[in-house]
Amino acid sequence: MMGKLIWLMGPSGSGKDSLLAELRLREQTQLLVAHRYITRDASAGSENHIALSEQEFFTRAGQNLLALSWHANGLYYGVGVEIDLWLHAGFDVLVNGSRAHLPQARARYQSALLPVCLQVSPEILRQRLENRGRENASEINARLARAARYTPQDCHTLNNDGSLRQSVDTLLTLIHQKEKHHACL
């Protein structure tokens, strides 16, 4: 049995890390949250990730140890091939993905892919970016502009303006609905 790869996307500040952290706290026997390999210090940012040097990253990529990889915001990101084992064992796997690299995920996982785009209103997004304090005003404006102009096609939209609990419940409902549909195919 093949699980689904849930490719969670959204602009920086949309709440992806908070959503993933909350999901990790809930008991989900068939849903695994994948960690990412990133060329960023382990203490930088709020994301639970595995920090790699660029050399380590390129070594893993060169040895085909990354199922998916991409470059964004001056960093390299990757998801290990272990997710393929999890999917083939029947687990659903949730990945903090990239909007720009959705086509790469579609090409590899095809019908097993469930793309979900996390969205928030511009006002809330600005507030979140300002509160976390990682970007200056011009960087925040650039992120807001990119968020406004780039929403992937053919993906499920999940609004994250409300409570974190509500967003997690909605995401789990979507995943379970797709499980039923997937089982009927």
Curated annotation (Swiss-Prot):
GO terms for molecular function: ATP binding; ribose 1,5-bisphosphate phosphokinase activity. ATP binds at residues 10-17. It holds the Pfam family AAA_18. SMART domains: GuKc. It is an enzyme of class 2 (transferase). It catalyses: alpha-D-ribose 1,5-bisphosphate + ATP = 5-phospho-alpha-D-ribose 1-diphosphate + ADP. Belongs to the ribose 1,5-bisphosphokinase family. This is Ribose 1,5-bisphosphate phosphokinase PhnN.
